[in-house]
Amino acid sequence: MPAAQAGVMPGSWAGKPAVLAAVLVALAVESTAVASLGTPLLPTIETVDHVSLAASQWALTIALLTGAVATPVLGRLGDGRLRRQAVLGTVATMLAGCVLCAIPAGFAVFLTGRALQGAGFGLVPLATAVARHNLPAERRGHTIMVIGVTTAAGIGIGYPLVGLLAQGLGLYAPFWFAAALSALALAAAMAVLPSSPARPARVDAGGAVLLGLGITGLLLVLAEGPGWGWASAITVGSAIASVALLAGWVAWELRARSPLIELRLLCRRPVVAANVTAFLVAVGFYPLAPLVVRFVQTPAAAGYGFGATVLIAGLMLTPFSLASFAASTVVRRSARHLSAEVVVVIGCVALIASMVLFLVARDAYWQIVTAMALDGFGVGCVYAVNPLQITGSVPAGETGSAMSFYQLARTVAYSIASALSATLLVLSIPPGHHLPANAGYSTAALISTAILIAALAASLLFALPVTNPAVRRTTGPAHD
């Protein structure tokens, strides 16, 4: 049966894979944009809700936390008969989160809304599973590639509009707009998404609980470590408990009949390469956007910064998204000449160049724009091919699960990067001041550069030809 006919599209859209592909990409863009909506608004959140820099960072961290917990469960649901319901339920949850954030009811309600929005991170493995199961071969690979890129590009797509709305109508206007977009996305998904396969996808409840508790503990340590003290009993105890829970989860999954994530499939070389490079790249590149947003909005009286508006800060991130999509086009056209591993190497080089530029030259807008464009191109290269490495190495029935682990690795990496950059900025605030020192930005950029160099080293290692027959047997294509 052709891929496009594996499910039945409701209504008049049946048999139109181009429409399905467009909706899947739109869902990925919308989910990522909404989940990262707080980034350009952090300084505004601090002012409106009268919270500290560390507290405002929770507008990002809590979305990442709920995304990390929800993604593996949604990924497993995406491999069975509840795939369509999982997509619709996730979009509806995001819609509810947008409405809560749009209500001026205090910081606690705002954070609750952001937590619900974080479920949107789980849409990426769901959309990938739908694409692999329901699109024809000639459209499937390109759609999966674009979905992979939008998970990064979506971070900057809506920033200028968010800045314009916040500047003209206040903090809550962008969330009303996001609620409207979520409602449109829900309507489109209801009209276009195909029916799910008949076979059930059993959710490993025990594995979900162990993984959820372990990830939650780990992310809490990363978020609260600076306030608790990295050597404090609660930080060390929470870290040990999180590691123990995650170790228990691995042991549980290896014995489970229907594991939440089939860990043995993750040992295949292309899958390992995708997850390792995606994790390191995410830790390395993710700090740049919040650093740039805060840097350009800092008053020039502080000795650095441009005193820019929220709108201008959002515009600084637009080159990131444009370059990400441009990279996906370049990757698609060069697919016959360059392997996925080589593309990842090229992406890592561009990422290192972007961070080095921000480290040594950030005195003019054009330097910021150039750094963000290089950052976007590098991310676009890496995240265009990572999903193809995974989907080409696992059975179709494990697509959602395998992609959920990939998304989970990136979400944890984003949390590490967010906590790291926030900690470095807080530590750089001089006594008696409320703004970070310029040196704090340099330190964050320097550490990010070192992490990206590690990502480059890993990508070069995976780009080497395989000579061990035992390893070569784990690199072949998956058989559905």
Spans of model-derived segments:
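Helix-breaking motifs and short loop linkers at transmembrane-helix boundaries and internal kinks
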Residues: V48-H50, L82, I103-V109, L169-G170, ...
